[in-house]
Amino acid sequence: RVLITDGVNAGGEMFVRSFASYGASIAFFYSNSYDKAIALSKDSSALNIRCKISNIDSLWSALEVLRGYFDDELDTLVFNIDISDNTLFDDMDGDKWRHGVIAEIDGLFYTIRALRPFLNRKNSSIVVTAAKGKNSGFACDILESYIEGLIKSLSKSLDTANISVNAIIYDKDKDAGMHIADAARQLSSGELSVITGQVIRL
């Protein structure tokens, strides 16, 4: 049972297809691109749920749908995010800071916190997949550092609950899509549940 937080944007489709090819039961969030979400659902037999994760009301509504689909149990949460913002510090105004950085940080925290009760199966896992470009700016570097700290802290907090927490930060300009998706799937497998607190760069 796998939830992917963005199955349409930020390369999310490759994660949906990779897990589906191995018979996983999948749900994915999307905030736009309705037609793409419907088409992907048909191709992968996955449940699509419209959700803007930085909006707490939208997130709680999505969780009600998810609760009925997965019966309050989840094996893997794949938090898919695009951090390839090349905005420099001198070009970062308050609006860009709130929507480009703070909203992403809020989305990570709120989603993982809200889904924590679902991660109650043996060897559950959280995998953060973050896409970045060749030219990382101030916002990208801030988010990358936040992800590194989050993985380290969260893996310690959830270790006694046998929940592994790892991240993959990858260059989205490289042609390695399915390789990245397969790496995320392998990190979520019970066989590699002893691996936690790692940030892998591809």
Model-identified regions with their sequence ranges:
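Canonical Rossmann dinucleotide-binding motif of NAD(H)/NADP(H)-dependent dehydrogenases/reductases
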Residues: 1-27
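Rossmann-fold scaffold of SDR-type NAD(P)-dependent oxidoreductases
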Residues: 5, 73-83, 104, 128, ...
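Conserved glycine-rich Rossmann-like NAD(P)H-binding loop of the short-chain dehydrogenase/reductase
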Residues: 24-38
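Rossmann-fold cofactor-recognition segment
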Residues: 44-57
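A glycine-rich helix->loop->beta "capping" turn
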Residues: 47, 65-79, 85, 164, ...
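Conserved mid-core segment of classical short-chain dehydrogenase/reductases
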Residues: 56-60, 64, 69, 79-101
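Catalytic loop of short-chain dehydrogenase/reductase
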Residues: 83, 88-94, 99-100, 107-111, ...
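C-terminal helical subdomain
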Residues: 160-163, 167-202
